[in-house]
Amino acid sequence: MVFGTGVDNVELSRIQKALTRSERFVEQVLTAVELEKYNSFQSTARKTEFLAGRWAAKEAFSKAYGTGFGKALGMHDLEIKNDELGKPFFTKHPFDGQVHLSISHSNLEAVAFVVLEKN
């Protein structure tokens, strides 16, 4: 049974501006594991795309979960990895059930869709 759905999109230029304003922005969004992956990318464009995708995915999760971000849920309560085929999935989350995630990018924005499913 579907518990909740969430979608979020973010312009890559908005993420780039946030990176310019604050050196800590990346650390506020990404966990240590995600930060390691982020730092493995050579190009600024790929780093921005990766960060935007993670931002959108975490925002989409918070909407599907029904709390948004705040005391009940923070960015570091969520962690995303990719499987051997590149499909993103949450490795860390507070939801008791299945979490389905899709992330897509264009040269202008990133979008993510999350479905939370109770067993």
Curated annotation (Swiss-Prot):
Q: Which GO terms describe its cellular component?
A: cytoplasm
Which cofactor(s) does the record list?
Answer: Mg(2+)
Q: Quick one: where is this thing mainly located?
A: cytoplasm
What EC number(s) does this enzyme carry?
2.7.8.7
**Catalyzed chemical reaction(s):** apo-[ACP] + CoA = holo-[ACP] + adenosine 3',5'-bisphosphate + H(+)
Q: Where along this sequence does the record place binding of Mg(2+)?
A: 8, 59
GO MF terms here are: holo-[acyl-carrier-protein] synthase activity; magnesium ion binding
Q: Mind listing the UniProt keywords for this protein, alphabetically?
A: Cytoplasm, Fatty acid biosynthesis, Fatty acid metabolism, Lipid biosynthesis, Lipid metabolism, Magnesium, Metal-binding, Transferase
Cite the InterPro entries for this sequence. Answer: 4-PPantetheinyl_Trfase_dom, 4-PPantetheinyl_Trfase_dom_sf, ACPS, Ppantetheine-prot_Trfase_dom
Tell me the compartments it is located in: Cytoplasm
A biological process (GO) of this protein is: fatty acid biosynthetic process
Q: Cross-referenced Pfam families, in alphabetical order? A: ACPS
Q: Which residues form a coiled coil?
A: none
Family membership = Belongs to the P-Pant transferase superfamily. AcpS family.
Briefly state the protein's biological role.
Transfers the 4'-phosphopantetheine moiety from coenzyme A to a Ser of acyl-carrier-protein.
Name of the protein in its database record: Holo-[acyl-carrier-protein] synthase
List the top taxonomic levels of the source: Bacteria, Bacillati, Bacillota, Bacilli, Lactobacillales
